[in-house]
């Protein structure tokens, strides 16, 4: 898939024919790359997010099958500070995909609202919205909070996700400003 995308982008570049559809594909790919990259940093494999019944290895109340976690433990010394598990992550059973976001308060907001959230809808809105936009974009290293941007419509629909996460808006507005867009409030 990436080889075909690369070839098509190369052709359009040399034909001086920019295609905005490629930006949408690239932003979706970057979010997936970021989630998978942070999973790897956490010592988790892709099968972890494919298993609907998987539980985070950070939760002290659950035993994680070794098939989902490479060493059945994580190395705190090598985890970026932004991915260090919070008290909520350690105390509330949750799916490991929620551990992938580099904003601790955002992770806590998601975990605390688990019962009332359609996680399939949330995941779709993050990765592949029906309106053609993505809810989150990643512009750099996935473990760096400043690499992540939330879209305007995502903030409107899922405002509680970033409640108390002022830095998310600061970083998002930085990226929006670089593209000449108005800042989020």
State each model region's role.
Residues 1-185:
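Transcription factor C-terminal regulatory/effector domains that mediate ligand binding, dimerization
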């Amino acid at each position: 898939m990436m080889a075909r995308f690369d070839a098509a982008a190369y052709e359009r570049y040399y034909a001086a024919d920019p295609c905005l559809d490629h930006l949408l594909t690239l932003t979706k790919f970057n979010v997936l790359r970021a989630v998978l990259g942070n999973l790897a940093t956490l010592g988790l494999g892709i099968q972890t997010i494919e298993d609907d019944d998987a539980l985070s290895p950070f939760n002290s109340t659950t035993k994680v099958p070794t098939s989902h976690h490479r060493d059945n433990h994580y190395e705190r010394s090598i985890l970026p500070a932004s991915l260090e598990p919070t008290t909520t992550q350690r105390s509330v059973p949750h799916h490991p995909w929620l551990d992938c976001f580099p904003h601790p308060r955002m992770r806590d907001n998601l975990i605390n609202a688990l019962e009332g959230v359609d996680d399939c809808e949330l995941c779709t809105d993050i990765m592949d919205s029906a309106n053609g936009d993505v809810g989150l974009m990643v512009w750099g290293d996935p473990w760096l909070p400043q690499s992540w941007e939330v879209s305007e419509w995502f903030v409107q629909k899922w405002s509680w996700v970033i409640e108390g996460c002022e830095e998310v808006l600061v970083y998002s507005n930085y990226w929006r400003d670089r593209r000449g867009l108005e800042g989020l409030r």
